[in-house]
Each structure stands twice: as structure tokens, then as C-alpha cells.
Amino acid sequence: MRLTERDLELLRWINGHGFVTARQAANWMGTCLQTGHRRMGLLHQGGYLKRQRLFHGAERAYWLSALGQQVSGDTLSCPETISPATYRHHWMMVDLAHDLITKTKGQFTPERRLREQRAIKGVGAEGHVPDGLLEVKSKKPIAIELELTLKGRERLEGIVEGYLDRDLSAVWYFVTSDRIQRRLNSIIDGERLFKIKPWQPRS
């Protein structure tokens, strides 16, 4: 299989998120679902991608193999496996990132890339890393958080307090339930840096 520059970009995009589905790859490529499945299948057959269906009825996950990382020139290590515990949050983040890019025409950096950048700068493991950063034109970055479960109050308070010291234009919390929204509202208490946005994933 002869890889194009677009294929290499696709591999690096996949690795930034950890894994994606064929549907999500089709969205990124701006093609139909059939084309997305075909391209991902060819990359898998060529040994550049691994794939697995983690749950019955779920979309199949694709992620980079060692060969895929090598040919793409990506410095970010590819996952060995996909964790069932984080599968739902990860694939929803890919959809959310696509929605944000489509609506704002901005650039999105996923958590894995942010952690890599932090390691390169030698910052270590201090401080909370958001689920992503959205950059829109000349504005300061917007931290993106996707909350699917109700975190403990003390933990959320620590994360919110930490954001107040960062050079951000906003922190957007996307929530999937009223209960999570109420918890966050009680902690944020009107602080203008934060916005809470109800969001529902694709079925």
C-alpha cells in the first residue's frame, strides 16, 4: 500500500486521540462512511492500524500500530491496547472535538498531545490536564472538559481552582446530565471564566 501525505496526517490525527472509529475518520476526511470504512480497512490490512470491537454493538476502535507510528513520524507513543474503562469517554471526546472544530473553525489539541507537550517542556505531572484545548483565531485557548460521571466535590473544587491561575480565555464544561450540571454550578458559583454546556453524544 502506498501511503499519501493525507494518510500520514490521518495516522497522526488518530494517534493524537488515542483511537477513533471509521465514522469519526470519515468525518475528519470529509467523506462518506463507506469511504471511511474502506480507508481504515486498507490501513489496517497494511499493518498501520490495529482494531478491536470492545463491546457488542459498539463501533470498532482503530489505533496506531508500531509501524503506523514509525511511518507517520509521530513522536507520541501509540497505545498498546484500548481500555474498556475509558472507551466511552475517549470516543465521545473525538465527536465533541469534531463538533467544536465545525462550529468555531478553530484548532483542537487533545489531551494526549497536551500531555506530550508537557513532558517535552519538563513540567512533569503537576496540575490538571484538560480533555483538550480549543484555539480560535487570536483568542487565548479555551480549556475543554467532558464530564460523563459525577466526580467528588473536593476533586472538582481543586480542578476549578487550578484553572483560575491559568492563561485561558474560558473553560467550557460539557455535561451529559442535569445532576452533573448542578454539581458544577454549585462549585463554579458564577465565576465568569467557566461555561457549562449540556451536550449529548451521537447514539
Give the predicted meaning of each segment.
Residues 141, 148-192:
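Catalytic cores of nucleic-acid endonucleases
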Residues 36, 128, 155-156:
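Amphipathic coiled-coil/heptad-repeat helices and related helical stalk/stem segments
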Residues 40, 44, 96-104, 163, ...:
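Hydrophobic, Leu/Ile/Phe/Ala-enriched alpha-helical segments that form helix-helix packing faces
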Residues 77-93:
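A short, highly charged nucleic-acid-interacting micro-segment common to nuclease
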Residues 191-203:
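Charged, structured surface patches that assemble and position nucleic-acid processing machinery
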Residues 52-53, 84-88, 97, 101-143, ...:
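Active-site metal-binding core of divalent-cation-utilizing nuclease and nuclease-like domains
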